[in-house]
């Protein structure tokens, strides 16, 4: 019995050591990625600011200003996403629940997304599927997740449309979704899209943190996330909340 107890203690210590080492490895990888991701827009801002000072043609100046503005937006988004992740990691993410008219909120989300959409060839539409629906839910976090998923759809949809909405699933869960007619995702890549700093298209702008934050927020609210996709036809990102 003494030997068995000692053996179990040794196994527990080995397991704890392996978990600690894996945690340190993930933190190191996170910091390395974060350093690279911050440096990229900063270099563009600094570099094109210097070039802008010497530019003479109005068209040339406008081009450099647009590049600087885009990288300013990217840097701000990156810092915001990192701050959100730090709250999630430390367990200090705040949740304030209130009674909410979902149809009214989704109309607001639709209007906001339409204002952000730069590609006029891809309309964004909210599809109401339920009559008046008032639920006790976390407004800010629901808006955050829907906005992140819509932003992701905008980046990869060049023609067609983007639709979103919600419906009752079974009797205990609400099912929320964003469907696009974008490039789609290969089967072997689906499991990676919710990882940190994952960008399936290295040329697309973004932090690679948005979907990871979505997953963390939804799981903190007791739900789950997923994606259904077909290459060349589009994707549906979804999540459920109790």
Spans of features found by a protein language model:
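Short conserved segment of the HATPase_c
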Residues: 185-197, 237
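Helix-loop junction within the histidine kinase core
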Residues: 86-97
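Short alpha-helical Gxxx[C/S/T] motif in the catalytic ATP-binding
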Residues: 210, 214
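Short alpha-helical segment of the dimerization/phosphotransfer core of two-component systems
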Residues: 70-75
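PAS/GAF-family sensory domains
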Residues: 9-20
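Short basic (Lys/Arg) and small-residue
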Residues: 27
């Amino acid at each position: 019995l003494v030997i068995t107890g000692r053996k179990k203690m040794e196994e527990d210590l080995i397991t704890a050591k392996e978990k600690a080492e894996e945690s340190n490895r993930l933190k190191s990888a996170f910091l390395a990625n974060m350093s690279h991701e911050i440096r990229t827009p900063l270099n563009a801002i600094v570099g094109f600011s210097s070039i802008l000072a010497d530019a003479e043609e109005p068209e040339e100046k406008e081009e450099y200003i647009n590049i600087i503005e885009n990288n300013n937006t990217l840097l701000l988004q990156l810092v915001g996403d990192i701050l959100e992740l730090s709250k999630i990691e430390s367990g200090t993410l705040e949740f304030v629940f209130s009674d909410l008219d979902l149809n009214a909120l989704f109309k607001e989300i639709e209007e906001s997304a339409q204002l952000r959409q730069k590609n006029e060839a891809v309309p964004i539409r909210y599809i109401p599927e339920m009559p008046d629906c008032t639920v006790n839910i976390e407004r800010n976090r629901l808006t955050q997740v829907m906005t992140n998923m819509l932003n992701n759809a905008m980046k990869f949809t060049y023609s067609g449309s983007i639709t979103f909405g919600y419906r009752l699933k079974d009797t205990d869960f609400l099912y929320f979704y964003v469907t696009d007619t974008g490039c789609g995702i290969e089967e072997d890549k689906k499991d990676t899209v919710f990882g940190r700093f994952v960008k399936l298209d290295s040329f697309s702008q973004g932090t690679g943190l948005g979907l990871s934050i979505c997953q963390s927020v939804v799981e903190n609210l007791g739900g789950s996330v997923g994606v259904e996709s077909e290459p060349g036809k589009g994707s549906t990102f979804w999540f459920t909340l109790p």
